[in-house]
Regions:
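Contiguous segments within soluble domain cores/interaction surfaces
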Residues: 2-111, 115-139
Length: 139
């Protein structure tokens, strides 16, 4: 098994900075308000070229939320974003967002920053957004 900090592939990704994809993987947002679940990736794990992700955002009690979800796709080691933003749709039956296509067009480390703001009727503490970062090594 590779040592932490040593490249795991020939593309410059390190074990310490890349997440290992598993369906249903979760991260708590940077502000601690919401949980971001990567329900699925097609293909799985995320791969070179176009991907489709299903993401669910939940409150602290695990209740799925509706609102506005966006994603920033970039390669931190290369200093550039993906050339195209995915279309984002919300399915009220599953309370999940589909993002498609997620263009991971080069090999290397990709940072996916999901940002969410819930639907609320008034400007309040509950309307404040949160974000979470997933990093995947694409080879």
């Amino acid at each position: 098994m590779p040592d932490a900090g040593k490249p795991t592939t020939g593309v410059g990704c390190t074990q310490a900075e890349a997440d290992t994809y598993v369906p249903g993987m979760k991260k708590v947002g940077d502000a601690g308000r919401y949980s971001f679940e990567l329900v699925s990736s097609t293909p799985a794990p995320p791969a070179l070229d176009d991907n489709a992700f299903v993401v669910q955002v939940s409150d602290a009690d695990g209740n799925p939320l509706a609102g506005a979800l966006s994603v920033a796709l970039d390669m931190p080691e290369h200093g550039h974003p993906s050339p195209k933003q995915p279309d984002v749709s919300f399915d009220p039956e599953s309370s999940a967002f589909t993002l498609d296509p997620m263009q991971l067009f080069m090999v290397g480390l990709w940072r996916l920053t999901f940002t969410f703001t819930p639907n609320t009727g008034a400007a309040s503490e509950s309307a404040i957004g949160d974000s979470a970062v997933f990093k995947f090594c694409i080879d």
